[in-house]
Amino acid sequence: MAALRMLWMGLVLLGLLGFPQTPAQGHDTVQPNFQQDKFLGRWYSAGLASNSSWFREKKAVLYMCKTVVAPSTEGGLNLTSTFLRKNQCETKIMVLQPAGAPGHYTYSSPHSGSIHSVSVVEANYDEYALLFSRGTKGPGQDFRMATLYSRTQTLKDELKEKFTTFSKAQGLTEEDIVFLPQPDKCIQE
């Protein structure tokens, strides 16, 4: 009887405190047997999805960018992205620090100071990679972003479908998803 009472009290406490939520679909999962050396090189950000209000406001003016992934001295990754912004080519460098399993990284935003978890969830290395990032922007403001990297600037319909399904599995909606158009400069070979 005492064991049953303890079980009941435990269930009540979980209900009061908020039962731990399971991720929408493996936020922290990574590509099995992730091979960082095969992930290196040139990628194009062909699709993005995010619950960020900034993203929702700006997604109509975003373009595909070129990202070169190189190893960092700390065992992580340096991502150098070139993109079109206000009719100018700009470059941004992100440093991803290794965090746990191969394919899982953290990124510290110099702008907001927030820390984001970044996972390479799926990659075939020669064609595409699906990444998922999450973090917080402030109290009660969770941030989620799915990214579709492509080795080419042209996407197959199957990849668009795969990315849409992947994004929705992360709790993002159809209006959170955008496939980025190619700009007329900044990402040429």
UniProtKB/Swiss-Prot annotation:
InterPro entries: Calycin, Lipocalin, Lipocalin_CS, Lipocln_cytosolic_FA-bd_dom
Impact after mutating T67A: Reduces enzyme activity by about half. Reduces enzyme activity tenfold
Family as reported in the entry's similarity comment: Belongs to the calycin superfamily. Lipocalin family.
Species in which this protein is naturally found: Mus musculus
Tissues and organs where the protein is expressed, per its UniProt entry: Abundant in the brain and CNS, where it is expressed in tissues of the blood-brain barrier and secreted into the cerebro-spinal fluid. In the male reproductive system, it is expressed in the testis, efferent ducts and epididymis, and is secreted into the seminal fluid. In the eye, it is expressed in the pigmented epithelium of the retina and the nonpigmented epithelium of the ciliary body, and secreted into the aqueous humor. Low levels detected in various tissue fluids such as serum, normal urine, ascitic fluid and tear fluid.
Residues of the active site: C65
GO annotation terms (biological process): gene expression; mast cell degranulation; negative regulation of male germ cell proliferation; prostaglandin biosynthetic process; regulation of circadian sleep/wake cycle, sleep; response to glucocorticoid
Name of the protein: Prostaglandin-H2 D-isomerase
One term under GO cellular component: rough endoplasmic reticulum
Keywords, in A-Z order: Cytoplasm, Disulfide bond, Endoplasmic reticulum, Fatty acid biosynthesis, Fatty acid metabolism, Glycoprotein, Golgi apparatus, Isomerase, Lipid biosynthesis, Lipid metabolism, Mast cell degranulation, Membrane, Nucleus, Prostaglandin biosynthesis, Prostaglandin metabolism, Pyrrolidone carboxylic acid, Secreted, Signal, Transport
PROSITE patterns, A to Z: LIPOCALIN (PS00213)
GO molecular function: fatty acid binding; prostaglandin-D synthase activity; retinoid binding
E.C. code: 5.3.99.2
Catalytic activity: prostaglandin H2 = prostaglandin D2
UniProt remark on domains: Forms a beta-barrel structure that accommodates hydrophobic ligands in its interior.
Record CDD domains: lipocalin_L-PGDS (cd19419)
Entry's localization field: Rough endoplasmic reticulum; Nucleus membrane; Golgi apparatus; Cytoplasm, Perinuclear region
Disulphide bridges: C89-C186
